């Protein structure tokens, strides 16, 4: 009888990659917060740590420098090009974007206040900047050798260094923007990188302590800090989580579409509010999933064509930090 119940439970559950669940959860909280459905901040910074984790997971093992650089640049292109085109279109149609937004440099060139549209793509800017920097660093043979020799020690030292960039001397005149500028939140990215090689109990304990200690007080808003901390500590200890099988597809879809939802929800939702009741306007934000479905196919074809044209190397169908869901029977 017990075996039968256990078997039924296993049939109802599936193991899903924790990063996929976190990406789906993060994008839901981002949209809910921005669209005033519910104030659940912390999703974007959680997503940034997941980017660092997945970059370490998928790009670090690539031995060929040429192939690693190409993989990193393709990852950047798959995110930067759609964002630039979307921002340029919005600028042309009247959104209050500036040239800094279109060039993905608003974090440093834009106005200090966050009440305007200029800062809509701050996360994408940080993503692009950090992936380019890490790709360039790993192309240096001596640094690559250090990473290979000290897979945990190198990101640990880098994490300590990036913590210095969040201090008052690096605020660049605006304390609030420390939460959004590349240099001052790079430590979230590196923290995700550090989580990936935490493969022993001792390392996991150290990394968990660093997660809690570094996040506490950074935002001066405990609920946001708790949300990010719980998400990252979960990733430290669980590389897969069990979820009801019926929600695996929605989770995987939201995770896969997260970039396009992030890019487009600022434009789609306000437009729908003007012509639809508020509740339906929120549901209508799922239009971003359809945008992703179409754009992803176009991007796949473009990247495949670029790969055949410029190099005889295999082209990954997905960017390194946006892997599809890993699902297994529980």
Question: PLM features: residue spans?
Answer:
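Membrane-cytosol interface segments of multi-pass membrane proteins
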Residues: 1-163, 173-174, 178, 257, ...
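Short hydrophobic alpha-helical membrane-embedded segments
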Residues: 16-26, 203-212, 262
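Hydrophobic, membrane-inserted alpha-helices
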Residues: 25-33, 134, 158-166, 187-191, ...
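Flexible, active-site-proximal loop/turn residues at the rims of small-molecule/cofactor binding pockets
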Residues: 37, 108, 195, 267-268
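Specific aromatic-rich, kink-prone transmembrane helix
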Residues: 51-54, 132, 136, 186-194, ...
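Alpha-helical transmembrane segments of multi-pass integral membrane proteins
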Residues: 87, 185, 189, 193, ...
């Amino acid at each position: 009888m017990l075996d039968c119940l256990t078997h039924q439970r296993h049939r109802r559950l599936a193991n899903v990659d924790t990063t996929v669940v976190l990406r789906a959860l993060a994008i839901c909280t981002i949209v809910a917060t921005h669209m005033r459905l519910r104030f659940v901040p912390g999703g974007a910074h959680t997503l940034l740590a997941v980017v660092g984790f997945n970059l370490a997971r998928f790009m670090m093992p690539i031995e060929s420098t040429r192939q690693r650089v190409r993989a990193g640049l393709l990852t950047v292109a798959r995110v930067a090009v759609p964002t630039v085109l979307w921002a340029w279109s919005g600028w042309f149609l009247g959104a209050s974007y500036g040239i800094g937004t279109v060039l993905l440099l608003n974090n440093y060139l834009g106005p200090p206040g966050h009440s305007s549209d200029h800062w809509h793509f701050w996360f994408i800017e940080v993503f692009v900047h950090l992936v380019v920097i890490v790709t360039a660093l790993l192309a240096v043979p001596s640094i690559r050798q250090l990473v290979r020799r000290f897979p945990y020690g190198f990101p640990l030292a880098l994490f300590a260094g990036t913590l210095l960039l969040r201090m008052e001397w690096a605020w660049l005149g605006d304390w609030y923007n420390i939460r959004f500028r590349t240099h001052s939140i790079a430590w979230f990215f590196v923290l995700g990188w550090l989580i990936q090689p935490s493969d022993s109990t001792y390392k996991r304990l150290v990394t968990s302590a660093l997660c809690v200690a570094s996040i506490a007080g950074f935002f001066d808003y405990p609920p946001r800090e708790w949300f990010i901390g719980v998400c990252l500590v979960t990733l430290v200890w669980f590389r897969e989580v069990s979820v009801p099988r019926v929600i695996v597809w929605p989770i995987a879809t939201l995770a896969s579409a997260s970039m396009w939802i992030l890019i487009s929800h600022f434009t789609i939702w306000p437009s729908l509010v003007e012509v639809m009741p508020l509740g339906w306007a929120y549901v209508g934000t799922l239009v971003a999933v359809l945008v992703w479905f179409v754009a992803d196919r176009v991007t796949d074809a473009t990247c495949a064509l670029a790969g055949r044209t410029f190099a005889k190397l295999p082209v990954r169908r997905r960017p390194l930090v946006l892997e599809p869901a890993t699902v297994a029977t529980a």
